[in-house]
Amino acid sequence: MTPNSMTENGLTAWDKPKHCPDREHDWKLVGMSEACLHRKSHSERRSTLKNEQSSPHLIQTTWTSSIFHLDHDDVNDQSVSSAQTFQTEEKKCKGYIPSYLDKDELCVVCGDKATGYHYRCITCEGCKGFFRRTIQKNLHPSYSCKYEGKCVIDKVTRNQCQECRFKKCIYVGMATDLVLDDSKRLAKRKLIEENREKRRREELQKSIGHKPEPTDEEWELIKTVTEAHVATNAQGSHWKQKRKFLPEDIGQAPIVNAPEGGKVDLEAFSHFTKIITPAITRVVDFAKKLPMFCELPCEDQIILLKGCCMEIMSLRAAVRYDPESETLTLNGEMAVTRGQLKNGGLGVVSDAIFDLGMSLSSFNLDDTEVALLQAVLLMSSDRPGLACVERIEKYQDSFLLAFEHYINYRKHHVTHFWPKLLMKVTDLRMIGACHASRFLHMKVECPTELFPPLFLEVFED
């Protein structure tokens, strides 16, 4: 048998013999194949003939250009392996197929089912991987064809001759410059993962939906609360310019021993009691400017005010924490250190207020957010002795909903801003409870004349 001059995809093709009907015909084919392999040396031909004669059946002569198609019983291990490889690749090809491919579009290299546009050509996964590995590992110089580069490359023969397969990849237009090295491939994979994660976050955001902002009715409520706070907040935004620092020597010499190892500096305590009455008055005025509060029975108003007064005063002090001087400004006028506030009567409560101030400094709260926090604290329906519990709870829900929508409107860049801010309500409630316990001990240890009447009225049961 001699090579046919017919070409396939630009490469010389070999005629494929038909199935061998009997052994006599098989031996004729052996002779034909020997003639076709005249390129081999005499010893190679003798070795080939000897191997063929050692089997009762004709063993497949493995050419990359031509494969004898024998009966199933005559297929050797190598042909079985090729078939298994083909089946595996065929299964892979049944996966995702891009929408831009026509139905049953074939690989331009081997004719297998194409899976996409790879390195400028429409190819199957097998040829894509072969081309990529060849370029990345610089394997093509080591490829060699035993049959003068005349192999036909199809989905059955593609694994038989690497040189002819690679040449056909180049011939059909696969671009070597598009194959990435390890570093570029890792960078591309990282970029793909980042884009995938970005899309996932965007889809998650869409699934959550657009965060609602305040309605017109809620804006009216927010405006009322904000105006009430601004009108009753001493010094407003000018507190830093108008504050006065408590002298350093005050609050450093404890005189009276308080329970639980705490000590009280009576001079510092005296300074604090002078500003406590106007501070309490401002909290009361804030509450009276809220229509919802004024609609409640007088008894409930008193209970709510007594319950929230220390909490609101602590909040107003905490939002005026100054990291540079490490002080809190009380009632917008007196800047005190942690030690001074502690020795002045508050003891461990001062630590909680300072810690709250340090935490809130990163929240960058505006007047409206502080005002809404105060309204939420004021309308706490769990205060003992309340008559209109459901109404107060409903009022608090209204403030909370408007508050949440306002937070959405503000678009803070702090992660989980809203739940973190709500946790501060819990912290303030704890401060109020600790102060109530501290006050009972202070009444016993400090002279009664040092306590202003309004202070006693608010904090006594």
Swiss-Prot record:
GO cellular component: chromatin; nuclear body; nucleoplasm; nucleus; RNA polymerase II transcription regulator complex
Effect upon mutating residue 355 to R: Stabilizes homodimer
Binding site for Zn(2+) 2: 145, 151, 161, 164
Effect on the protein of changing residue 316 to H: In PRTH; impairs hormone binding
Binding site for 3,3',5-triiodo-L-thyronine 1: 435
Annotated segments matching region Interaction with NR2F6: 244-461
Superkingdom of the source species: Eukaryota
SMART domains, sorted: HOLI, ZnF_C4
Consequence of substituting residue 331 to S: No effect on thyroid hormone binding
Feature: DNA-binding region: 107-181
Localization per record: Nucleus
UniProt: Zn(2+) 1 binding residues: 107, 110, 124, 127
Entry's family note: Belongs to the nuclear hormone receptor family. NR1 subfamily.
The protein's name in its UniProt record: Thyroid hormone receptor beta
